Every structure is written in structure tokens, then in C-alpha cells.
């Protein structure tokens, strides 16, 4: 009783912003551009709580008057069966084979109406559409399977189980493995797995690949010697000497100890010292070329750089000791030149700001307008997406409610009889009500319903060779879970949502195509025209004069 106002609100919602019920993978922002069926459309198809309450009140009033409760329910079921039979007859007449009329050449005197024939042939060819190939004899859709082969039937049953499992699982917590896994002889029919497990397997695979891949070997390269022009200091040289005491040659240490000696070494000694340093470095890196740890490599780098720096500083000081004054003059001239450049740049900036001061207000206004437009567009998009999500959730909830109510109405008579039989000995009203609510056996349906069910019909058609085939026994046991559920209801948009995730070659595979046709025709009862139109848009097959279906 508390849910009735919610249904009223849903019924009074506007038509704008509704979504299509089938394509859940489309972008939600595109939904308001193409408005489809609104929630008012659901009143025609979905039995909501209001209608169910009206029906239950009518039953209560009729029972109070004196009419039999079970008699009313039997009348309702009889009416429904008559309506279903009439619908079946109409469909059979529509799908009945009608031989094509021969288009004969019509002569009126000496004229031949060939143009009319060409137009007629074009219209006939345009009605036929291309479909994925489905076998005729070895096919679970065919009425007789006496001459059918075992292997194709087994593959079709595996694909059928995978499809039924994908249609009935909770996609928020579980996902199906690929369709190819359903033909595995160890686990025929495929299986589901949790999203948590899939993510864990992916992370484990990435870690294993990272562990297998060989690490990249880093080759140590000696950096090139750079000559610095800065003024050397005695303090820096002594510090560098203390750092480079373990990696420098004895000649370089002698040079760094006596930077201002009266007997400067010759150029040959400098060259030999640099060569000795390079030889020592190469000799330290060449033997065995074993990969060192990162800390050792960094320490060796620091030692070599300090040794090289001391050598270059001493060489530059000995060469450019008499020309220190010229260097100072050059530094002064460079500083004056930099000051001139800064003054010129400041003057240019002041002139440019005065010129741009007139342009800035116009640019600010245009930027503000564009920002406002972007914000409005973004907020409208968010509103549209939220509205579309709300309508899709409401429609899905409406479909679930309809399925549950149809099941309750279908089993209402049988459940009522069982509850009535629970009053074997009338003792106390409260105790009898508790007995009635405590134990109610599950209703398995009558013989007529079982005979018309798709699972029992399929079992009666299958050949004995297939039933004795060992892998087929496993898949038949798995299909029994879905076959014994007489109240299994699957909506067409759920089927299209699952098929949207399949690849094109999987949709066109003969075994999978047969399983899809079986589910569409016998379980979901989806119109063939709707499925063909969806398939044309999914596969983008051009309309042609030939058909690959039966």
C-alpha cells in the first residue's frame, strides 16, 4: 500500500528525456536528442500496483457477494488461454508458407510490360534480408532431429547454456567468460566468474610478466670533459682533493696540491695525466663488465667527476692566470649590457600594456560568455544524463515488478488451493494462519504447461546417441537448472544487451546463431522483425536478394 504514490509519480512524469529500453551501452547524453517511449508507455505493457490492487479488491467484493474464489480464477485462466491460442493461430497464418506467384509476361497486343516485372522483382528482393547461416538438419530449432549429427548439436547446446547463464546472472558482481570457453570438453557450457577474481587474475598476470621480463642492463658512459671559465678557489680545490683521493691518479694529486708553484708542469704531463685518468677509469669498468649496484655506481661517478673537475680547474688556472683582469672587465661589460636589455624590455612592456588596455575588456567579455556557455552546456548534460538514468532504472524496476506479478497471478489458483488444504483441522484462527504460512510446497505446473515448455520439448527431440554422449550429459545436467524453472522470464532488452558485448564473428557463428534463435523464439518470444533490425544495425549487412536462414 505504501508503493502506490510512487507509481502515481512515475505515471505523471513528462515525456521528455525518456530513453529507449534496449540499448543500455549507448551514451546517455545522446538520449534526450532522440526521445523514445516514456513511462506512460509502460502503463500499456506493465501491470503496476494500482491495477493489481483494483483486481484484488474486485476479487474480495465478489467473494463477499457469494461467488467462488477458485471459480473466478479458473475463468480468468481460461480467458487467457483462449487469447494465447488466438494469437498463436494468427502468427501461424502469418508465417504459413505461401508459394510465390509466377510473374508472367503480360502482353497487350504487341507491347511487353517488362518494366512492371522488373519493379516487382526488385520489391520482392528487397523484402528478403541476409542472416547468419544456420544449419537445417543438425539444428535444435528443427522439428525433427532423427538424422542430426551429435557434434553440432553438442556445440549448440553449449552455446545455449552460455547464453542462458549470461542472461540470468547479476552483472554487478559477476561476468561471463568468453563464448569460446563454452566448448571446452572439461567444462562444457562455460561458467561465470566474479569481477573481483578477474581483476585479481589480471594483476597476477601483470606481475608475472614483469617478473619474467629481463631487466635492462645499464651501460656506464664516461661524460665528456668540460672546460669551465669560472675563477678557481683554493678552498674548492682542497675539498675536491679530499673527495677524489681514492679515484685520482698520483700525477693529478700532485698538480692539485701545488696549484701556484713556480715550476708549472708541461703540456705533455697534463695530457699524460688525463690519459692516465681515462685509462684507470676504463680499466675499472672493463674487467668482466659485471653489473654493479646503483649506490656503488653513483659513488664511482661522484669520485670521477671530482677528479676530472680538479684537473680541469688547475689547467685553466695555469693557462689563464695572467689574464684575470681581462675576464673581470668582460664581466663588467656583460653586466652593463644586461642592464640595458632589461630597461629596453620594461619600456616595451609599458607600451604594449597601454595598447592592450583597450582590447582587454572586449576579450574578457567574450571569455566570460564562452565560460558561461560551457557551464550551461555541462550542467544541462548532467541533468539529461541523470534524468535518463532515472528513467532507465524506473523502467527496469517496472519490468521486474511485472514479471513477479505475472508469476504470482499465474500460480495464484494453485497456491490458493494449497493454502486452503492446509486447514485440515480447524482449531484456532491464528494457529491455522501460522500453519498456512509456514509450509507451502513449490508448484511444478500442470501437465499441459510441462508439455509446452521448451526444455521438455527439446529433450523429447534429442536423439539417443546425443544423450549417451558423455560430454553431452554434463551440459544437459546444467541446462536442467534453467529448464525446470517454469517461471523463467527474460526481457528482450536484456538479450540485446548481452549480444551487444559479443563480437561480429561470434554473432555470425552458426552454433551461436542457432542458440540465439532458440532463445529468441522459445524462451523470450521476441518478434523476429525486431531482432533482424537490431542485427542489421549491429553487423551493418546490406540488404540483399538471398537469405541464409533455412
From Swiss-Prot:
Q: Could you tell me what this protein is called?
A: Coiled-coil domain-containing protein 60
Q: Name one Pfam family in it.
A: DUF4698
Entry keyword Ligase: no
Please list the residue ranges that the record marks as compositionally biased, kind Low complexity: 235-256
What are the UniProt keywords, alphabetically?
Answer: Coiled coil
| Species this protein is from | Homo sapiens
Q: Coiled coil: which residue ranges?
A: 71-98
Q: Where is the composition biased (Polar residues)?
A: 336-345
Superkingdom field: Eukaryota
Keyword presence, Coiled coil: yes
The annotated region (Disordered) lies at 1-21, 219-293, 336-367
